[in-house]
């Protein structure tokens, strides 16, 4: 789960020469702003297909945002990608609820009630209990409005107290962010972590030497998620929320035992932790 622009460029905006997330470490196999590019290509090819976007790239661009690479304000990626629904945060609850709704035959434009999602609408007549953010025009006109908007967003990252947020755009377009999805319980964290993952790259990548980034995490264990720090240099709270969610000790030990069975295991586990590990 890697932002395509961070993947491609250094902090000084120089193009990276390698890509650790691509087979063989070769650069240039995915486009800049991949969510937007792929979303529009899918829409052109499958005009009526429901398009659901998520992950770090979509999550951090769910509302109007400052684009460091172009040094300009950009609209919600939901609008630019042509997607129907954006899942923000980690998404386990939301993606299951969306799948259930689609399986039940509900049109995608009626799936507007799921926490942890963002959708667009042309009217606020059926949108209730929301906080109105500064409009796109107001954001573009004054940087202070952008700061005020982001502050409201930061204050509504809690799944218990978070409000629904509405960001108006020209031509009666509204981007609606539902309240954050409920955090995972310890049992749910354990269940997600202990699914029968392949724990390897696809065999098709063997000829290229595999995926370099995998070596860094193959013998690591994620024990928790969420961060209450809100550090100005880090977007983690804005993606995972500020509530700490932890796996059980038994679950971590079961994964550790599983790692020892790998033929490449050399006797040590690189890391056990996650964001704010010292606070959990």
What are these regions (language model features)?
Residues 105, 183-186, 263-266:
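Low-complexity, intrinsically disordered regions enriched in charged/polar residues
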Residues 144-220:
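N-terminal [4Fe-4S]-dependent radical SAM core
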Residues 2-49, 54, 60-63, 68-79, ...:
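Conserved Radical SAM active-site core
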Residues 90, 183-187, 247, 255:
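Short coil/turn linker and secondary-structure boundary residues
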Residues 1-170, 177:
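Glycine-rich beta-alpha loop elements in corrinoid/cobalamin-binding modules
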């Amino acid at each position: 789960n890697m932002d395509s622009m961070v993947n491609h460029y250094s902090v000084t905006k120089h193009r990276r020469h390698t890509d650790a997330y691509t087979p063989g470490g070769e650069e240039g196999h995915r486009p800049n702003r991949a969510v937007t590019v792929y979303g529009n290509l899918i829409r052109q090819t499958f005009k009526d297909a429901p398009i659901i976007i998520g992950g770090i790239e979509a999550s951090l661009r769910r509302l109007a945002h400052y684009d460091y690479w172009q040094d300009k304000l950009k609209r919600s990626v939901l609008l630019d990608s042509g997607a129907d629904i954006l899942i923000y945060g980690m998404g386990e609850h939301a993606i299951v609820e969306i799948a259930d709704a689609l399986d039940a035959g509900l049109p995608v434009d009626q799936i507007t009630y799921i926490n942890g999602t963002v959708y667009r609408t042309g009217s606020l007549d059926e949108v209730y209990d929301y906080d109105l953010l500064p409009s796109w025009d107001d954001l573009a006109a004054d940087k202070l409005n952008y700061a005020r908007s982001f502050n409201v967003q930061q204050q509504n990252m809690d799944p218990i107290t978070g409000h629904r947020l509405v960001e108006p755009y020209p031509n009666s377009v509204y981007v609606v962010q539902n309240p954050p999805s409920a955090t995972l319980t310890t049992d749910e964290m354990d269940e997600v972590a202990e699914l029968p993952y392949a724990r390897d790259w696809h065999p098709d990548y063997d000829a290229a030497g595999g995926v370099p980034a995998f070596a860094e995490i193959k013998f690591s264990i994620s024990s928790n998620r969420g961060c209450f720090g809100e550090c100005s240099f880090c977007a983690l709270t804005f993606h995972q929320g500020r509530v700490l969610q932890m796996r059980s000790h038994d679950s971590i030990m079961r994964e550790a035992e599983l790692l020892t069975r790998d033929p490449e295991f050399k006797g040590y586990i690189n890391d056990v932790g996650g964001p704010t590990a010292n606070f959990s």
